[in-house]
Amino acid sequence: KRYPASTTKIMTALLTLENVSNLDETVTSEAVDFENVTADSSNAGILLGEQVTVRDLLYALMLPSANEAAYMLARHVGGSWEQFVDMMNERAAELGCTGTHFCNPCGLHEDDHYTTAHDLYLIAKEAMKDVTFRDIVSTVQHRMAKTNLHEERIILTTNQLIFSSFQPWSYANCLGIKTGHTSQAGNCFVGYAEYGDAKLFSVVLGCSSSSKEYPTVAASFTDTKKLCQWGFENFTSKTLARQVEEVTYTKVKLSTDTNQVILTAKNDLVSLLPRELDVKDLELQSDIPEEVDAPIKAGDTIGSVTY
């Protein structure tokens, strides 16, 4: 059980993308969007009565971690931010989160607003399936469109791993996702990185605001980089079974054509495994009936195998 701080906004973005079909529709900020946002908390400078597109609100949410954007999106999607929080908790349960409870859409501290590293991974994994989300969280800077109260403005990411490729703590393999910080939560970061065919998620919570290597950089970033580098150095994607290759077979009854049928994997089965592991050394455990009754056609599911 940990406090997530602004990594909460991954769920806010996910629900917005799942429920809003037109990201160019505008949302007008209201007084309620600022009631729970402290003056010194992260923001995008959105003013009362300002009309901002959902798309720009998502960028404001995920790059500078704007709390007013979180409340605007929550109200727009849920009807009220309180109803939206109910949606957040329902969606978390649907994703298999067992240690998460949200109280607000932005992550500002409340004692009953908590999660776990594994639950954040489940939420982030689902969010990263969305192309727009992936584009947003891998963006360093975004130009928000002119509004009724603002000229164009540029907002910047708080993700120090991608902010500047010239800094020694940057990490070229990092493609997102979200930072977080409160005094109670410490420094938090949900990360995602790719190297070749390998893909890694990382979640670090409660980190120091100063790393050993770089005193001005939070340990959440340097720890994430170390975790991902270790992961890529020691693990790689390996194919356990290919769609067209025989995995096993089973007997067939009541058929005049054959007494057995070849079984193949429904899709290529790929897993992230230790580099030194030989796939041939893995033990195959099958949950397949010894025999099945005809008729059987290509594509029918007969059973499952576990490596």
Predicted features, each with a name:
Residues 1-118, 122-131:
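Active-site-adjacent loops and short helices of periplasmic peptidoglycan-processing enzymes
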Residues 97-98, 109-114, 118-307:
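Domain-terminus/edge residues, biased toward the C-terminal soluble/receptor-binding domains
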